[in-house]
Amino acid sequence: MDVSHLLDALNPAQRDAVSAPPGHYLVLAGAGSGKTRVLTHRIGHLVSACGVRPSEVLAITFTNRAAREMVERLEGLLGGVVRTMWVMTFHAACGRILRREAPRLGYTSSFSIVDQADQVRLVKACLEELDRDPKRFAPSGVHAQISNAKNRLVGPDRYMQQVASFYDQTVAEVYEAYQRRLAASNAVDFDDMLMLTVEVLERFPDALDHWQRAFR
């Protein structure tokens, strides 16, 4: 495949980044400097000139919009093979991994994902179960604390060990009840998609090895 077009319209620094030998690199650049162009052309170079299979490509973004933009640019460079690449957000990639690995954690692969409104309703039900006043412990506020803990990869047991007030104690108890109810329903929330994927990769070396080998 002719790959000369991949270097067209790139400045010297971008060209160096795109055409560097396969390996690990960190590209630092400011806003509007062409980072997405470098990433997409780098992927194109790896697939076209370095023997990397499209299915071995993992390109992660923070937003769905950025993922769509990257897919569109890659399709312009490589065509339909882009459909076999993993070009998506962190949550989408972790969700796909979790669909395969969920049975290791006691879920089935057909687990459901609870939306924001249902998450808050579930927290409210947990507060009622614990006989806590929802006026003192606003469900949305307790949910925000649980979400923040998950984003720091702090599970219910570890959170309980860090309590410093009655409010913290309540959040910890709700957190435990909330996770128990989710698991009983074979459900996860948006934050679980990241936290549970990390848990799988940390607890099960064979899973980590599989996914490390899956991408180049």
Language-model features and meaning:
Residues D8-S19:
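Pre-Walker A adenine-sensing motif
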